[in-house]
């Protein structure tokens, strides 16, 4: 079936991270004390990360949204990554010394090609693209993020799953020594997620390896994470070390922890409330304290590309 593409956005229309950080430094120099009281941790000086590196050969994508992206600071200091703590700024502070190299990814299960691959070898066969996507958290906040990544559909095709493979399962690194949040039993570690084969081969799904044209920061899931923009953010598993082609629906971390609150599909749906809050509206991070919440779009606005995946499925039961 023909996949319709959303409107493109020129890279020049996004505030560059250098310009943003230079502007932030100027503001801090003049009024850091007052700003800190008003805005909290996001206004604290960002620690330079010497491991940041520009990514070469990145092409633009017709799948990018026409909305302006959040700042680099928004994206890298306001995160859910429970492997490094449960507060929004915990990953930024606690992942600072995490070493994401060397890294390997294991591909196994019902596929003709399997094995364990160095990260660099794993991504080498695939083209890098910038995908500027909306990201909607299940907690009713959102961002727009300029990811750099590789097509998950291309990855699936490369490893040639057999007809037995109905789902793709993902697993995060389990290392409580280096990932301090894993020392607490917040979840049944390691973090696990999954998609149907049809979802994994949809053109919107990517494995992200960067943001704002640079390598992915630790707090955002370095060196490789899943991005499925029509689903709630918790589906975007970070720090991936295993990809498995399986014949049965994989168990997923939040669904195992609280099945009444977090389903397997986790499609953004303003008509299906979380048991403890409405999903009809969302707060855009960085929009300002007095900016009204905005209406949440079905499938986060990507319905033209993905709605057909769920034809005949009761979305109230299969949330």
Q: Which residues does each predicted region cover?
A:
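N-terminal secretory signal peptides
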Residues: 1-21, 25, 34-35, 40
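Boundary at the C-terminal end of the N-terminal hydrophobic targeting segment
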Residues: 42-44
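Structured, non-membrane catalytic/scaffold regions adjacent to prosthetic-group chemistry
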Residues: 46-319
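Short, locally clustered residues in the helix-turn-helix/winged-helix DNA-binding domain
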Residues: 31
């Amino acid at each position: 079936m023909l996949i319709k593409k959303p409107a493109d956005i020129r890279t020049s229309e996004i505030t560059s991270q250098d310009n943003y950080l230079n502007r932030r430094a100027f503001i801090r120099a003049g009024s850091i004390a007052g700003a800190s009281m008003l805005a909290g941790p996001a206004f604290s000086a960002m620690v330079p990360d010497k491991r940041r590196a520009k990514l070469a050969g990145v092409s633009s994508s017709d799948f990018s949204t026409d909305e302006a992206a959040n700042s680099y600071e928004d994206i890298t200091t306001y995160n859910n990554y429970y492997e490094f703590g449960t507060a929004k700024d915990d990953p930024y502070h606690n992942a600072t010394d995490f070493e994401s190299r060397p890294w390997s990814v294991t591909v196994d299960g019902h596929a003709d090609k399997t094995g364990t691959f160095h990260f660099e070898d794993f991504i080498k066969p695939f083209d890098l693209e910038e995908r500027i996507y909306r990201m909607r958290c299940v907690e009713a906040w959102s961002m727009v993020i300029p990811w750099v990544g590789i097509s998950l559909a291309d990855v699936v095709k490369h490893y040639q799953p057999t007809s037995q493979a109905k789902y793709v399962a993902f697993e995060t690194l389990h290392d409580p020594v280096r990932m301090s949040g894993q020392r607490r039993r917040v979840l049944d570690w390691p973090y696990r997620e999954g998609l149907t084969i049809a979802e994994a081969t949809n053109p919107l799904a990517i494995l992200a390896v960067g943001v704002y044209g640079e390598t992915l920061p630790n707090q955002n899931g370095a060196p490789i994470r899943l991005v499925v923009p029509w689903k709630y953010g918790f589906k975007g598993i970070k720090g991936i070390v295993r990809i498995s082609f399986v014949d049965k629906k994989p168990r997923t971390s939040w669904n195992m922890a609280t099945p009444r609150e977090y389903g397997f599909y986790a499609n953004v749906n303003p008509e299906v409330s979380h048991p403890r809050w409405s999903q009809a509206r969302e707060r855009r991070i960085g929009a300002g304290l007095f900016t009204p919440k905005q209406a949440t779009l079905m499938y986060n606005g990507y319905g033209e590309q993905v709605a057909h995946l769920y034809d005949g499925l009761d979305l109230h039961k299969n949330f």
